[in-house]
């Protein structure tokens, strides 16, 4: 069976892994998933990530905890295949009053809402992370 929304699957695996206190989660890899993982690592939401395998690459995300609590409290898909959500740079959302991030797909690549606002770019809102 083919996967209809691989990004939602990735976010669900991370959410479920954190709920079950897993050390790491594995999933099929893609360029967009690796870019999202790199952004989450840069923002401090995950400990590390690695791509393993050549024929069928797998993305392994090492989850992060602080004092035995999840670092990611909320991770939510916004734009989905049935309803794409685009915003201009002046209408980009602020997640939890700036405590969280919105992952934005812009013409210059994937970036957080703060970086997109600073660069004056809008784009597709992939997900919210807090």
Swiss-Prot record:
InterPro entries linked to this entry: Ribosomal_uS8, Ribosomal_uS8_CS, Ribosomal_uS8_sf
GO BP term, example: translation
Taxonomic superkingdom: Bacteria
Key word Metal-binding present: no
Gene3D superfamilies noted in UniProt: 3.30.1370.30, 3.30.1490.10
Keywords for the protein's UniProt record, in alphabetical order: Ribonucleoprotein, Ribosomal protein, RNA-binding, rRNA-binding
An annotated Gene Ontology molecular function: structural constituent of ribosome
Summary of subunit composition and partner proteins: Part of the 30S ribosomal subunit. Contacts proteins S5 and S12.
NCBIfam families named in the record: PRK00136.1 (NF001109)
Family, as annotated: Belongs to the universal ribosomal protein uS8 family.
Role played: One of the primary rRNA binding proteins, it binds directly to 16S rRNA central domain where it helps coordinate assembly of the platform of the 30S subunit.
Name of this chain's protein: Small ribosomal subunit protein uS8
